[in-house]
Amino acid sequence: MKGLVKVNLGCGPKGKDDWVNVDYGILALLAKYPFLKKIAMRIGILPKRYTKWEWPKNLVIHDCRKKLPFKDNQMDYVYTSHLIEHFSKYEAINMLNECFRILKPGGYIRVIVPDLELLARKYVECDHNFFLANTDKRHAKDIVLADLFNMWFYTEKNREPISSFYGSLYHKFTRGHKWLYDFESLSLMLKDCGFIDIKRRKYREGNVPDLEFLDHFQETSLYVEAMKPTHTNPKLLESFLR
């Protein structure tokens, strides 16, 4: 694996130092600039639980909804976990197109999102315990099943008003879920971007390296990998055959 160029988009505090780690938002900025973190803690914007997180030292601050700061055909692997569900669908498609651009022919992408099919099935089955086990315990007490289900789609501030000024400021810089995917919908998006060999994978299993460190959220996630073709881009070939 020596010499491979690997990028983790939306790395959060789980980045690995031999990857290019990219993230954006207030938490990433505070991790990148410790003096801002101290100020945020002092005025109460940053919850104490976030102070224990160790972000990667080589963190790149970049909004992945915009053009990625990498050259064409530069990356061997792209990994992105629990990121695109925070984007509008068209923004997620734009990012996946960018991933296709920066991957080398034969390179792999691994996309991990909350599994919409699983969540829907657990709701229909009235599996209250599943949602309680996979919901922030601070917000799960005495909440009915429908509310637990809705919390996968909407932000906390949609459920109840944020009482403090600093709490409101914090929520302005955080993003709830905007669009969820099942295997069929995510596969179609990847296919439309030009990817082939699209497969559903298991937790910490696949072609992308370092999954034993990178993969998390086993109970609720959909894991999908796809490859950039080594031959002519199928989208361009199709346009010539029309």
Residue ranges with predicted function:
Residues 4-121, 184, 224-229:
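Conserved SAM-binding loop
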Residues 90-98, 104, 108-242:
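S-adenosyl-L-methionine-dependent methyltransferase catalytic module, highlighting the catalytic core
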